[in-house]
């Protein structure tokens, strides 16, 4: 199974790109599966702001557990990859395609984790002027109320630095 991740903020044209690429017989895609960002926030690679359990205790316990694994971080990444490979693979098995495309915008917020989990995947980075992204977001979901849109999701502060760092550092071929 081959994976392609479209890295993009919301409202940057990723759905159109997904539909265009998904029209190819070898590419299968599913609307924003959100498989990566939740496992990136188990407390090992990123902090959890809110959870219905003691996320601080859970993060520390998971880190201690990982430290006792024979191959430590590598065993943990292998287990997480087994989960996502299974999920992507099962979805891919419903088609005759050989490539799965994931365009979940939240993946842009966990890029160091994603590239560690899938260093051999293909990454397509889609950019759009940040103010055009935010304007589209505010107009599409908040009737043009930029303040309400920003309070709900500060897209500019979240996506621009994360994507800029990824493009600048190029940890994987783009």
Where on the chain are the PLM-derived regions?
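PAPS-dependent sulfotransferase catalytic domain
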Residues: 91-174
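Hydrophobic anchor at the beta1->P-loop junction of P-loop NTPases
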Residues: 6
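Pre-Walker A (Motif I) flank of P-loop NTPase domains
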Residues: 1-3
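PAPS-dependent sulfation machinery
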Residues: 28-110, 117
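P-loop (Walker A) phosphate-binding loop of NTP-binding proteins
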Residues: 9
């Amino acid at each position: 199974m081959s994976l392609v991740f479209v890295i993009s903020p919301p409202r940057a044209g990723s759905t159109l790109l997904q539909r265009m690429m998904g029209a190819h017989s070898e590419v299968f895609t599913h609307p924003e599966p959100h498989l990566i960002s939740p496992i990136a926030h188990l407390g090992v690679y990123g902090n959890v702001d809110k959870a219905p359990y003691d996320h601080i205790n859970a993060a520390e316990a998971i880190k201690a557990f990982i430290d006792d694994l024979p191959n430590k971080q590598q065993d943990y990444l292998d287990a997480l990859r087994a989960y996502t490979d299974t999920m992507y693979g099962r979805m891919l098995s419903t088609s005759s395609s050989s490539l799965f495309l994931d365009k979940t915008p939240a993946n842009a917020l966990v890029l160091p984790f994603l590239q560690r989990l899938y260093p051999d995947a293909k990454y397509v980075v889609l950019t759009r002027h940040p103010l055009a992204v935010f304007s589209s977001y505010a107009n599409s979901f908040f009737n043009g109320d930029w303040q309400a849109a920003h309070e709900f999701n500060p897209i500019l502060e979240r996506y621009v630095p994360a994507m800029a760092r990824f493009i600048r550092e190029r940890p994987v071929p783009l």
